[in-house]
Amino acid sequence: MKIATIDLGKEPLFLAPMEDVTDASFRYICKEYGADMMYTEFVSADGLIRDAWKSREKLVLSDDERPVGIQIYGHIPEALLQAALMAEEARPDVIDINFGCPKNKIAKRGAGSGWLRDPEGLVDITRRLVRAVGVPVTVKTRLGWDEDSIIIGDLAEALQDAGIAALTIHGRTRS
């Protein structure tokens, strides 16, 4: 399996991004036990722009954990773009956009799975981000916002056309 030029082998083991779990120490342990590709905790675009310590700390990467991706989330397109450029400075192997987080405090603002209510905006910001950064962009999302709006088929095709290198699908809706 490959993500852009990153060869992950035949049956790669991924460490998913998990808030307050996949910090640098945990990623180190997971790499020791065979993780082929890892992601940071998700990083708030707003937090990066405000230069919040907690957000900046999540950008600290080690060559020992490669390949590694930085996952970002946010609800304002310009903030997501700026955050992606800031994340790129940390030299990740990929930048992942979180369009799947179901937490109310995230989704109700239009971030995470909240983007599933605006698929055109979701695809547009993805396309802009792919063009803006020099590393592969991946996306994590869900089947749709709810059972009445399963959009993953059309969304996956549109995201592929937007230039993403890989898509992770959480196999259920937000609700």
Residue locations for each model-derived region?
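Glycine-rich, positively charged N-terminal anion/phosphate-binding segment
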Residues: 2-4, 9, 18-93
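Short beta-strand/loop segments at the ligand-binding rim of alpha/beta enzyme cores
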Residues: 8-13, 66-69, 132-143
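Low-complexity, compositionally biased segments
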Residues: 10, 23-26, 99-101, 127
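A general structural-boundary detector
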Residues: 13, 17, 109-112
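Short, flexible loop segments at the rims of nucleotide/cofactor-binding pockets, characterized by
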Residues: 14-17, 73, 145, 175
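Alpha/beta enzyme core
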Residues: 32, 78-111, 115, 119-175
